[in-house]
Amino acid sequence: MTLPVPDVSKNLFDLNGFCSIVTGAGKGIGLTLSKTLAYHGSDLVLVGRSTRELEAAADTIRAIGRKVRTVVTDVTAEKAPEMIVNTAMDMSRRIDVLINNAGSMTFADMLGVDDKIWDDIYSVNVRAPMRIMKAVLKEMVKAGRGSVINMGSSWSSRASVFNQDGGGVDYCSSKAALQALTRAAAQDVAPKGVRVNNIAPGAVDTPMHADHRDLLYQFVKYIPMGRMGVAEDLAGTAVFLASDASTFITGQTIHVNGGMLMVD
């Protein structure tokens, strides 16, 4: 198929008429990205485990003036991909953007990790995004357009999540697997007009880190830009990858980490 060339006389970041799915949308990065997409014109399907959080998030999206549906499910559930796709298609008859944001973080070291820890984190961070992406890509391929954004991590490119003595073999490797999955999936669907990319945040202060924020802030000294990341730092990259501003970009990982990977 002949892929379209963006019309630079128009607002390339305009998402009006889009339908976007965001997993892990009830709080933190997922909520911030959902609001950002809505501000730029997209309708939303919000996916998460907490009815209370999703309803609050949905109220915010409605206040912005966009259509919104919620899907209360664990992303690892067998029927989750079907539920998510059906909800989006029922609302908008199209899916333009998927942000696979839901994730899990644990800190096992190589000698301490066991099968359950390993299987649990890979189920959330790799298997669930793969299954949801597969279901969504079927609709995007039919339409001949769409953008999948996987939420990776800068820790896919370096070891030792929260200390210099090790730890995080499960988390780091799962995010590296997601990064590789992004590239492979992108190659498969690129001829169909569909893009798959990966955002890799560095140290970002979110509710996920509430129990170890003191450890997280030890990393400020390794960030050349001199501060901890926040969810809003990822918003522009997400809109860029969701929009027609990035129609010739696929299979890429964009690190958003204040320059953390520039230094050892």
Language model segments and positions:
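Alpha-helical segment proximal to the catalytic Tyr-Lys
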Residues: K138, R183, Q187-D188, T247
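Conserved glycine-rich cofactor-binding loop
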Residues: C19, G26-G28
